[in-house]
Design a protein with these regions (language model features):
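Hydrophobic transmembrane alpha-helices and immediately adjacent juxtamembrane helices
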Residues: 1-142, 146-258
Length: 258
C-alpha cells in the first residue's frame, strides 16, 4: 500500500489540492449551487405540480428532481475544472505540474477530481435538502451510479479541455451560458421529450445531454424517453472521447508549453 502511494504521490498531492480548493470556499462552490437548484424544485415543483399532475406516471414535482440534480452536477463539474485549469495556466502553475514526473493520465485525473467532488457534494446536498418537499425513489441504483459516473467524467474532462483552450474568463462562461445551459434545458429537465411535437421531438434526440438526463432519470424513477442502454452508450462514448482529448493535451503539451 505504501509503495502504491509513493508511486502516485504526485496524483495524490494534485487531487488533494483540487479538493481543498473546493472545500475552502464551500459557501460559494457548494452551498450556493445547492440553494439555487433547490429554488427550482420549490418554485417549479410546488407551483406547477398542482397543474401538471403526472408525467410518465410520476408526479411532476418528483419528475423534475433527477434532471435538476443532473444539471447542477454537470455544471459544477465543468465550471470547477474549467476555472481551476484556466487559473493554473494564468498563474503559470500548470507549467510546473506538466513538467513534474507524472503521467498524462495522472495529471488529467488529478485536475479532474476537484470538479467530481464538488458535483457529488452538490448532488447529495440537493437531494437531502429536497427531502422535506419530495420523496425521490431510486429504482435502479446500479444504472444510476454508472450514469452519474459517466456524466461527471464527461463534464469534468470537458472543463479541463475548455480551461486549456480558453484565452479569457469569458470563454469559460460562454460555454456554460451558450452551450451547456441551453442543451440541458432542452434535454428534458422540466418535461418529457415525448410530449414535444415533430420536428422538435426528433431534434431533441441529437442533443447529447438528452441521453445523459434520461439515464439518470431512469436510475431514480425507472422511466426514460429512450432506451437506457442507448443513453449509457452515448454518454460513455462521449466521456471516453473527452478523457482521451484531455489526456492527449497533457501528453503532447499542446497549448501548455510557454
Amino acid at each position: 500500500m505504501s509503495s502504491l502511494v509513493a508511486r502516485h504521490r504526485g496524483l495524490l498531492a494534485l487531487s488533494t489540492r483540487e479538493t481543498h480548493r473546493v472545500l475552502k470556499l464551500w459557501t460559494q462552490t457548494v452551498a450556493a449551487p445547492i440553494l439555487s437548484s433547490f429554488l427550482f424544485i420549490a418554485v417549479f415543483g410546488l407551483s406547477l405540480g398542482g397543474r401538471i399532475k403526472h408525467i410518465d406516471g410520476v408526479p411532476y414535482e418528483i419528475f423534475i428532481v433527477p434532471g435538476l440534480v443532473t444539471m447542477a452536477m454537470i455544471q459544477a463539474a465543468y465550471g470547477n475544472n474549467s476555472a481551476s485549469v484556466f487559473q493554473a495556466r494564468f498563474d503559470r502553475y500548470l507549467n510546473d505540474v506538466v513538467a513534474a514526473p507524472m503521467r498524462s493520465w495522472e495529471v488529467n485525473l488529478g485536475l479532474s477530481i476537484g470538479g467530481v467532488v464538488r458535483a457529488l457534494l452538490i448532488g447529495g446536498g440537493l437531494l437531502l435538502l429536497s427531502l422535506p418537499l419530495v420523496d425521490v425513489p431510486v429504482h435502479h441504483p446500479l444504472e444510476l451510479m454508472v450514469a452519474v459516473a459517466l456524466a461527471l467524467t464527461l463534464f469534468a474532462s470537458f472543463g479541463v479541455v475548455v480551461g486549456i483552450y480558453a484565452t479569457s474568463w469569458d470563454h469559460t462562461a460562454f460555454v456554460t451560458n451558450i452551450v451547456i445551459l441551453p442543451l440541458t434545458f432542452l434535454g428534458g429537465v422540466f418535461y418529457s421529450v415525448d410530449l414535444l411535437p415533430s420536428p422538435w421531438h426528433e431534434i431533441s434526440h441529437v442533443n447529447p445531454i438528452f441521453y445523459l438526463l434520461n439515464a439518470v432519470r431512469y436510475g431514480f424513477l425507472g422511466t426514460s424517453d429512450v432506451s437506457v442502454a442507448l443513453s449509457l452508450a452515448v454518454t460513455g462514448v462521449l466521456a471516453a472521447a473527452m478523457v482521451a482529448w484531455s489526456s492527449w493535451l497533457f501528453r503532447t503539451g499542446h497549448r501548455l508549453k510557454p
